[in-house]
């Protein structure tokens, strides 16, 4: 059985833990009460057998998060790029809770583009990985501001294509995310 994290312990490879209080507060700012936060496990391990999960790839196929090199003991205390990744992965928890077949769609996620345009569609009209990117990119925009968002865009973590002026971006995210989280 995998090691379960005790308070103030550093999680070892192969260990699992629940969300920290800080992480819950962070994700509640995005998903409100639409996720059962007490049941979300974070693994410091490969989801795939024989450690086949790429060391720099996070996976969330079953409502639980699997990190290898990108694991942090508390993502709420991490830098903005790791918080973006954490919110992206928590988006898959949210999608699964809404009934999306995350495992099935995830089988081909390495083939799909995470890039998107904000063209007036609702979030629900985008594919799975683009939904998660839009949610995480907007989180970065709202939390770290336009310049923090632009920094991650320069690193190709934020994957929006098109116009990048602050007022237009703000308006387009609001339009795409209207009614979110449902």
PLM feature spans:
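Active-site recognition of the HExxH zinc-binding catalytic motif
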Residues: 84-96
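Alpha-helical membrane-targeting segments
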Residues: 1, 47-56, 60-61, 98-119
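Metalloprotease/metallohydrolase-associated module, dominated by Zn2+-dependent proteases
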Residues: 7, 19-28, 35, 100-182
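Short, contiguous pre-domain boundary segments
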Residues: 1-13
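Auxiliary, metal-adjacent structural segments of Zn-dependent hydrolase domains
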Residues: 11-61
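Short, solvent-exposed loop/turn segments at secondary-structure junctions
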Residues: 45-49, 65, 71-73, 91, ...
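Short pre-active-site segment immediately N-terminal to the catalytic Zn-binding motif
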Residues: 33, 52, 65-87, 122-124
């Amino acid at each position: 059985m995998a090691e379960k994290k005790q308070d103030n312990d550093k999680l070892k490879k192969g260990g699992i833990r629940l969300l920290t209080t800080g992480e819950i507060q962070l994700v509640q700012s995005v998903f409100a009460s639409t996720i059962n936060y007490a049941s979300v496990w974070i693994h410091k391990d490969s989801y795939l057998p024989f450690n086949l999960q790429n060391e720099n790839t996070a996976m969330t196929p079953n409502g639980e998060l699997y990190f290898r090199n990108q694991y942090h003991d508390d993502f709420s205390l991490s830098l903005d790029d790791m918080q973006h990744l954490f919110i992206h992965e928590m988006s898959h928890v949210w999608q699964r809770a809404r009934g999306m077949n995350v495992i099935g769609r995830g089988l081909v996620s390495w083939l799909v583009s995470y890039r998107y345009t904000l063209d007036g569609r609702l979030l629900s009209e985008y594919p799975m990985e683009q939904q998660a990117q839009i949610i995480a990119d907007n989180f970065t925009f709202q939390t770290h501001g336009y310049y923090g968002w632009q920094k991650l865009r320069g690193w190709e973590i934020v994957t929006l294509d098109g116009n990048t002026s602050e007022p237009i971006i703000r308006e387009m995210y609001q339009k795409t995310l209207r009614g979110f989280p449902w």
